Amino acid sequence: MEIKLANPRGFCAGVDRAIDIVNRALDVFGAPIYVRHEVVHNKFVVERLKERGAIFVDELEAVPDDVIVIFSAHGVSQAVRQEADRRGLKVFDATCPLVTKVHMEVAKYSNDGCECVLIGHEGHPEVEGTMGQYDTANGGAIYLVEDESDVEQLEVRDPTRLSYVTQTTLSMDDTARVIDSLRAKFPHITGPRKDDICYATQNRQDAVKQLALECDLVLVVGSPNSSNSNRLRELAERCGTAAYLIDGPEDLDKSWFANCKNIGITAGASAPEVLVRDVIEGLKAIGASAPVELQGQEENISFSLPKELRV
């Protein structure tokens, strides 16, 4: 069995920054450091940070007074920010700058009283944070759609003043179809000048398509609650290749590889490379050869840390 590695794969700049913020805060201020929501959607990463003294909570009401709290890479609503300000909590914001870009778009539409459609997955923390940027006090409204059927049922107040934004970790192909449906139903709808789906999501989806065409089976390293990891698995399957989402080598099932000559491995944007290496070792133990790295899009993007943590 030959192993082929997608390129690029794994951590993106926003995830790197978010994890660095938690680690630097622990270095500078010591434990405990509170983090609202999992800083990134990966079990391994979260457990390592817990071991260092990070405490993950779902809501700010679980955070004591006079402590440091970090907002996750997925972003938070304005209501959460206001609560933190009201309580005087010291906040470090690990929101991905590309999510912040979407937040700013929504805030602009809100201030203009322009209705807004968000394409995204209901219940995902990024979606909750983005929806929470819209203030209906200016007379507008924000709507959430996930697929074309949602668009068919969508009714807005003024279709001549309507815009859309998207969650950053969606399937590019699915999102394009939803946007086409929106444009067909609401010809005056406008969108962002630059696509809201982030560069890392696009690059990893392009890479997994190539991987799926060259392999009998694709393994996506990532946690079940990772949106972008799930999209990679779905995309490989749509290419006609069997695909599995795994947290690590402990999830490997020998029966998957009975008739496989080429096994592809990729990783979601929140999955560390160490897990990929562990999976490779697990495959070698059942007869796989050394991995071959495929050609792919080079990434050299990085995001700066808050000033207090640049030590």
From Swiss-Prot:
GO biological process: dimethylallyl diphosphate biosynthetic process; isopentenyl diphosphate biosynthetic process, methylerythritol 4-phosphate pathway; terpenoid biosynthetic process
Catalytic activity: isopentenyl diphosphate + 2 oxidized [2Fe-2S]-[ferredoxin] + H2O = (2E)-4-hydroxy-3-methylbut-2-enyl diphosphate + 2 reduced [2Fe-2S]-[ferredoxin] + 2 H(+); dimethylallyl diphosphate + 2 oxidized [2Fe-2S]-[ferredoxin] + H2O = (2E)-4-hydroxy-3-methylbut-2-enyl diphosphate + 2 reduced [2Fe-2S]-[ferredoxin] + 2 H(+)
EC number(s) on file: 1.17.7.4
Disulfide-linked positions: none
Residue positions binding isopentenyl diphosphate: 41, 74, 124, 226-228, 270
Oxidoreductase listed as a keyword: yes
Gene behind the chain: ispH
Top-level taxon of origin: Bacteria
Signal sequence interval, chain numbering: none
Protein's UniProt name: 4-hydroxy-3-methylbut-2-enyl diphosphate reductase
GO molecular function: 4 iron, 4 sulfur cluster binding; 4-hydroxy-3-methylbut-2-enyl diphosphate reductase activity; metal ion binding
Alphabetical UniProt keywords: 4Fe-4S, Iron, Iron-sulfur, Isoprene biosynthesis, Metal-binding, Oxidoreductase
Function: Catalyzes the conversion of 1-hydroxy-2-methyl-2-(E)-butenyl 4-diphosphate (HMBPP) into a mixture of isopentenyl diphosphate (IPP) and dimethylallyl diphosphate (DMAPP). Acts in the terminal step of the DOXP/MEP pathway for isoprenoid precursor biosynthesis.
Residues of the active site: 126 (proton donor)
Family listed: Belongs to the IspH family.
Free-text cofactor note: Binds 1 [4Fe-4S] cluster per subunit.
